[in-house]
Regions:
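GH16 jelly-roll
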Residues: 1-456
């Protein structure tokens, strides 16, 4: 391998005259700033000026005298006229479709931010029979189950054997719970106030205590709006609800006189097949008998995509008029369900009840004597507000054999098997107040101007 020669310096290269000439020629740059070689032999064409070929002056336009041209003009005007008419008719149609649902005047008749529990408005409903749903809770006035703090109203389920002197053995056998002794029971029916645990009959003292509060007899509306700001509970088989019932059941027993469920949910996790605490439902209950309740025609669920309803506060609301009931969340632009009423097809016809029978007897129309002119009966009466947290049920809210449900609704010992599985469901319940519903505020508006009669 030959040894590489060291590079020559600039001064050394310039010492060779032949080398310098070649280098100078190769690196020569023109003194002119133009990048185009100044060669006289190149012809550069001058810029051509734009020349218009537009005809000026008066010239004959024979196509304008063609009769077909006049027809084309008329056709264009006809098309334009129909387009304009279409816009006008669409605007008129939109106006008449929206006009019945334009928000009118409302009078705020009640607002509560729960700095304290206003006992002039809120009443505890105390019973042990599940209020017709077969839930496993005993509703109480105990401050462990309902209380107010800086976060608002809390409705929290607790275990009976941890918050009372009733033992685990008492829950199952030879113990009588009689709420008539201290006159705490708010029902007039003994079966709602007295129970004895008996293993032979399968009866059991409710293993859960919770609370249910209502504005019955204090605050109610017939048409208007309701908004409740709340955070929902966390835990398997917990059933929170914000709902309304009629002040006077003028059409008869449930569901003849109706029920408005503003919000119902389940405390189960997102993996629960029927929808856990990432879902909530709005529903109307109505029908001539309990077996013919047509709630399934007027129910809808809202799923939250991220998180669930136990992680933050949401506004659950309805707007109720003679023509419709509108369910929404957080604001009126977030519609959950719209149920319109039709005077030509009242709810009795919508349910198809005229074709149904029970005990070989056709079902009579329970709303035949209604004065409603919009076909909205039974939702033409005053309704009051209820806030509660139940646990379990035997009415199908938690479907049998779904999500490892530990009891069968129709079983005589449903509460027993539910309680036996406490080691599975209790760890899913939130800590402290998180296992309950936290209500930050309630607002109720009556339709119309303040001081105006609600008889719309």
């Amino acid at each position: 391998m030959s040894q590489a020669q060291p590079p020559q310096s600039r001064s050394h290269r310039q010492a060779n005259p032949n080398h310098a000439s070649a280098t100078s020629s190769a690196l020569h740059t023109p003194t002119s700033p133009s990048l185009i070689s100044q060669d006289d032999s190149l012809d550069i064409a001058p810029k051509r000026r734009f020349k218009s070929y537009r005809l000026r002056g008066d010239f004959e336009k024979p196509w304008l005298s063609d009769p077909a041209m006049k027809k084309t003009k008329w056709n264009n005007w006809i098309v334009r006229s129909f387009i304009l008419l279409g816009f006008i008719l669409a605007g008129v149609a939109c106006f008449f479709m929206v006009w019945p649902y334009i928000e009118g005047s409302y009078c705020l008749i009640y607002e509560d931010h729960f700095t304290t529990l206003n006992k002039d408005i809120w009443t505890h409903e105390v019973q042990i029979d599940g209020f017709g749903t077969g839930s496993f809770d005993w509703t109480t006035t105990d401050p462990k189950n309902s209380y107010v703090d800086s976060q608002g109203l809390h409705i929290v389920p607790t275990l009976t054997n941890e918050t009372t002197s009733i033992t685990s053995h008492d829950l199952f056998a030879n113990y009588t719970l009689d709420l008539t002794k201290d006159k705490s029971c708010t029902s007039k029916t003994n079966t709602s106030c007295i129970i004895t645990s008996d293993p032979k009959k399968g009866t059991m003292i409710p293993p859960i205590r919770s609370a249910r509060l209502s504005t019955k007899g204090k605050k109610s509306i017939r048409y208007g709006k309701v908004e409740v700001v709340a955070k929902l509970p966390k835990g398997d088989w917990i059933w929170p609800a914000i709902w309304m019932m009629p002040e006077d059941s003028v059409y008869g027993e449930w569901p003849r006189s109706g029920e408005i469920d503003i919000m119902e949910s389940r405390g189960n996790s997102r993996g629960y097949p029927e929808g856990g605490r990432n879902f909530y439902y709005g529903t109307l209950h109505w029908g001539p008998t309990a077996e013919k309740d047509s709630y399934w025609r007027t129910t809808h669920a809202k799923q939250i995509r991220r998180g669930d309803y136990s992680k933050s506060y949401h506004t659950f609301g309805i707007q109720w008029t003679p023509n419709y009931i509108y369910f929404y969340i957080d604001s009126r632009i977030h519609q959950i369900m719209f149920i319109g009423f039709d005077k030509d097809r009242p709810l009795y016809d919508l349910g198809g009840f005229a074709r149904m029978a029970e005990n070989q007897t056709l079902l009579a129309n329970p709303w035949a004597m209604s004065n409603s002119t919009t076909g909205n009966a039974p939702f033409d009466q005053k309704f009051y507000l209820i806030l509660n947290v139940a646990v379990g049920s035997k009415n199908g809210w938690f479907l049998d054999h779904v999500g490892d449900k530990p009891w069968i609704d129709n079983a005589k010992n449903a509460q027993w098997t539910f309680w036996d599985a406490a080691s599975k469901w209790l760890p899913t319940w939130g800590d402290g107040a998180d296992r309950g519903m936290n209500v930050k505020s309630v607002k109720m508006w009556q339709a119309g101007q303040c001081g105006q009669s609600s008889e719309l």
